[in-house]
Amino acid sequence: CKWDGIINLDLLWKQYKRILKGNGAIVLTASQPFTTKLISSNYEMFKYEWIWDKLKPTGMLNASHQPLRRHENILVFGIGKTIYNPQKIQNPKGVEKRSLYKYQRENEGGETVGEIKQGGVSKNYEADKLLPITIQQFSKDNKPQHPTQKPLELMKYLINTYTNENDMV
């Protein structure tokens, strides 16, 4: 396909750095082997990855040569500490008692990391909520307008996670 070509990653990063503001994040989707190329092209800005579980596997034509693919990588890049607003979900078990502890330490750059506890409880602790995990499940859209189209709900999730209200996307 004409649209599915190798992009110039040096030019891509030059433009991303030009438009990235403050503690903004660059969030990209990829599949192997491009995932590895993308991370390697800017390891300094790479933060971590999520896994998007599509719930339905693809790749039936290659099923006799390799496993079906049911996930894509979501790669997060940024300069310094990026905005992160965890999208908590309702705990199906309801309110649970959890052991909490205080911790704080300095990272290699001398920044204080860890949660500042107030009265022994994390200031963002909600007993009936669960913090996100790196594997997120979103069904693919039934009638996509593009072969690589991502689900609207996945994009909303990422926008809510990596931006504050009224931020530019």
Language model features by range: what are they?
Residues 40-169:
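Class I S-adenosyl-L-methionine
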Residues 2-59, 72, 76-77:
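Conserved Class I SAM-dependent methyltransferase catalytic core
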